[in-house]
Amino acid sequence: MSTDKTYCGFIAIVGRPNVGKSTLLNKLLGQKISITSRKAQTTRHRIVGIHTEGPYQAIYVDTPGLHMEEKRAINRLMNKAASSSIGDVELVIFVVEGTRWTPDDEMVLNKLRDGKAPVILAVNKVDNVQEKADLLPHLQFLASQMNFLDIVPISAETGMNVDTIASIVRKHLPEAIHHFPEDYITDRSQRFMASEIIREKLMRFLGAELPYSVTVEIERFVTNERGGYDINGLILVEREGQKKMVIGNKGAKIKTIGIEARKDMQEMFEAPVHLELWVKVKSGWADDERALRSLGYVDDL
């Protein structure tokens, strides 16, 4: 019997919306798991990303951005998901953006001060800071806010110093058996990942009109005789005008979304994919907690 020690633990990636948490997770894993977009609030579920390297297994929880605005049911549930992720982990990576500091950052920090887990502060997008002279005083200001385990300036986009974060994570994993086989990179189903890929393309190809008012339901996900997958995706929007926007002129927009989503699915599933998309108006879904539960928004709380 092998007596080699193994190390395993859960790490929450937290921060206000749009600071680069999902990009950081994807870089730490070496491939795309969490959806990234320039819009705030693109991550709606806690995605578990798993990175195994030799005896070390880091299980990353990618939270929705914690934010102060809680009026809509979907926002309340997203904040609940983010807060519950902080409570049950060995380590927290708190992501902030360059030299910006907002009331939302302050709110996340206050939640972390109440927690027991040590916190790494990842100062992201430092390569985008115009006035480099402002960076050091800002890092000193951040250091005075809390007793951080470490403060690491990074660029999740380029990968700068992401290996430093990974190294700190490894050092703080407790001795434990691995929770997942070493080839696992997420505990989410292929059906769930298909819906996330479609949603990312919607975010990417549509204007700022649709930050929350769109979601994706996978109605059919089956293997076919060609060794690939037949996938039917239903895109839910809140208003008729949004439906027209998703479809585009003579169906051009939804065609582009479908083509790009299919490419990503084929790469992720390593098999041919036949994808069909429909758009349906379901008014008020983002305000209706029952509808959100039926769409799986609270399946992991």
UniProtKB/Swiss-Prot annotation:
Give the subcellular location.
Cytoplasm; Cell inner membrane
The molecule here is called GTPase Era
Q: How does it sit in the membrane?
A: Peripheral membrane protein
| GO CC terms | cytosol; plasma membrane
Q: Which InterPro entries match?
A: G_ERA_dom, GTP-bd, GTPase_Era-like, KH_dom-like_a/b, KH_dom_type_2, KH_sf_prok-type, P-loop_NTPase, Small_GTP-bd
The record lists the organism as Salmonella typhi
Family, according to the entry, reads as follows: Belongs to the TRAFAC class TrmE-Era-EngA-EngB-Septin-like GTPase superfamily. Era GTPase family.
Positions of the region G4? 124-127
